[in-house]
Amino acid sequence: MQIFYKSPFRKFVKKQTRSFQLIIEDEVEKTTISPDMCASKKGDLVEFRVHKFFYGKQEFLIAYRFQEAEILFFTIGPHENFYRELKRYLREAG
């Protein structure tokens, strides 16, 4: 299975501490092992799945798209304004 990362995902991870980067790496690995564990979103984000995890007391979300042989990670961030930022990125990249 091939794994690809979009630039917002890479930029967010690059700015974080090493300990948080390792946790993100573990969460990405969990997602690649069973990519269909998360439910698909509804509405205009229907092709995306979102994986949720906690770091400290903060909830973070990872948005990804899963197809037969590849996983494409789009963005990662705290729950606050997450879907708004994802939609903005899709409009600008669109």
Features from the language model and the residues they span:
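Arg/Lys-rich, positively charged N-terminal/basic patches that mediate binding to nucleic acids
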Residues: 1-27
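Active-site micro-motifs of SAM-dependent methyltransferase domains
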Residues: 11, 30, 81
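Residue-level detector of beta-strand structural context in well-folded domains
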Residues: 1, 49-51, 62
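A short, surface-exposed loop/turn module that caps and links secondary-structure elements
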Residues: 29-56
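Enriched for short, Lys/Arg-rich terminal
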Residues: 55-61, 65-94
